[in-house]
Amino acid sequence: MSQTFTKSQVAEHKDDKSMYIIIDDGVYDITNFLDDHPGGAKILKRMAGKDATKSFWKYHGKSVLEKYGTKLKVGTLAEAAKL
């Protein structure tokens, strides 16, 4: 089930128990993806709870989001957060 999050709600998910990131208007749970990330867990931990859109698109193409996004997406960013 997809949920709508505010930026402050996403910001609460920034520790080892629960890590969320924002990419475009999607919210992704990366908690169990840390060990699988080819670039290492360190960068994901640094972005946890934040908008990772710029960093993501700097290093990844659309195919990466298509491959992993469906598994990791837990919701969307609330309209009010898009300023």
UniProtKB/Swiss-Prot annotation:
GO molecular function: heme binding; metal ion binding
SUPFAM superfamilies to which the protein is assigned, alphabetical: Cytochrome b5-like heme/steroid binding domain (SSF55856)
Pfam families according to UniProt: Cyt-b5
Keywords, in A-Z order: Electron transport, Heme, Iron, Metal-binding, Transport
Origin superkingdom: Eukaryota
Family: Belongs to the cytochrome b5 family.
Family annotation (PANTHER family): CYTOCHROME B5, CYTOCHROME B5 A
Protein name per Swiss-Prot or TrEMBL: Putative cytochrome b5 B11H24.095
